[in-house]
A protein has these predicted regions:
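Acidic, glycine-rich loop-and-strand cores that form catalytic or ligand-binding grooves
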Residues: 261, 265
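Active-site microenvironments that recognize anionic phosphate/pyrophosphate groups
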Residues: 1-167, 173-246, 251-254, 267-268, ...
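Substrate-recognition/cap regions that form aromatic- and gly/pro-loop-enriched pockets
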Residues: 271-273, 277
Length: 357
């Protein structure tokens, strides 16, 4: 992997990740951009004890542009974009409309491919491995910033999820605090350790799922994907490395080598689970793509027991059947009590049925 760091016209950082060591990245950003002005603020909820980012400047962010005006495509034929080069492998840059900025953290955009019409599932194993390298490198770099407490790499896909740019891309949030979801995991981790005389909760969850077998979706030598026993979403899969590590930087070479094959197969199964159509005519390519969120859970940077935390990826869709979405209604949004219409065992069986031939 070759890494090239440069700056956009407004001073934001842009990083190219290339598979070839002899790739030269010399193009400059020729757009007449004003300096980025953000108003990001972290406010703490006194009742719930969590944090909310207030970011009013995001009201003006780019919203569903036509494909020929996509800001994440390479700069070609005189059309200037966020990426000055005419081509790229993987590109990462500071978000122009960040939810977190300055002392409140940092937000970055990760462009997986220059192909506007592709998706992560369309990548080759080598391309997926390069994205993993980029996630890992950014996790290491962002973890060194004094204001950053946790690094979150994720992908939102699909208009149903709320994606405003159709180009295949993900994001990285570097939070100035440990997120509420992770805090709850750490609390459960400590309680389990106390109750079992030192056993690790993540290790036990993975061992129990592998022993039961009913919710396993696929396994490799170094990774296991399963639908959790108490899945919140209709189709939700957790992907764990067999060897517990706290974050992406700690994965060994064997796990890194196997990851692309496992993850690409998992994403392709997600695209097949609703492939029978919705009864309203021929399916379009976009309709065949299941909307999802893919979220890497990593240990907080300076947590006292970070070595006990287990890196894992959670992949889920809000689609429950063809043409029908799982909306967060009163119980979920008002009280954070999820109601799942699809039994986890049935979801796992469906995801096994659509395995690649």
């Amino acid at each position: 992997m070759k890494k090239t760091t440069t700056r956009l016209a407004d001073g934001r950082e842009l990083i190219y990740y290339d598979s070839r060591d002899d790739t030269a990245r010399t193009a400059t950003d020729r757009r007449p951009l004003d300096p980025v002005s953000t108003a990001s603020e972290i406010r703490h909820d006194r009742l719930l004890g969590d944090a909310v980012a207030i970011a009013s400047h995001r009201q003006g962010r780019t919203y569903h542009p036509p494909a020929d005006q996509c800001p994440l495509c390479p700069t070609r034929e005189g059309r200037l974009t966020e990426i000055p080069e005419a081509d790229y492998d993987v590109a990462v840059f500071e978000n122009r409309f960040p939810s977190l900025a300055g002392d409140s953290g940092r937000c970055e955009v990760v462009c997986f491919t220059p192909d506007h019409d592709a998706s992560f599932a369309d990548l080759t194993p080598a391309q997926a491995a390069l994205v993993l390298d980029a996630w890992t490198d950014r996790t290491a770099a962002l973890s060194q910033l004094p204001q950053v407490a946790q690094v979150f790499c994720f992908e939102n896909r699909g208009a149903e999820i709320g994606v405003t740019l159709g180009h295949p891309h993900g994001q990285i949030y570097a939070y100035p605090f440990t997120t509420p979801r992770t805090e709850r995991m750490l609390t459960s981790l400590a309680a389990h350790r106390e109750a079992t005389g030192g056993r690790n909760l993540f290790d036990d969850v993975l061992a129990d799922e592998r022993a039961a077998g009913r919710r396993i979706v696929l396994e490799g030598d170094h990774w296991t994907a399963f639908v959790p026993y108490a899945a919140h979403w209709p189709y939700e899969v957790h992907l764990y490395p067999r060897r517990r590590v706290p974050d992406l930087t700690a994965l060994d070479d064997a796990a890194r080598t196997e990851f692309p094959q496992i993850y690409l197969e998992l994403l392709r199964r997600f695209d097949r689970i609703f492939d029978e159509g919705d009864g309203r005519g021929p399916r379009t390519p976009d309709a065949a793509r299941t909307p999802y969120i893919a979220a890497w859970h990593q240990a907080p940077v300076r947590a006292a027991d970070r070595a006990e935390f287990a890196l894992h990826l959670e992949l889920f869709t809000i689609r429950r059947t063809p043409g029908k979405l799982k909306f967060l209604a009163g119980s979920e949004s008002g009280m954070n009590v999820f109601i799942n219409d699809v039994p986890p065992e049935a979801a796992a069986e469906r995801l096994r049925e659509v395995a690649s031939k």
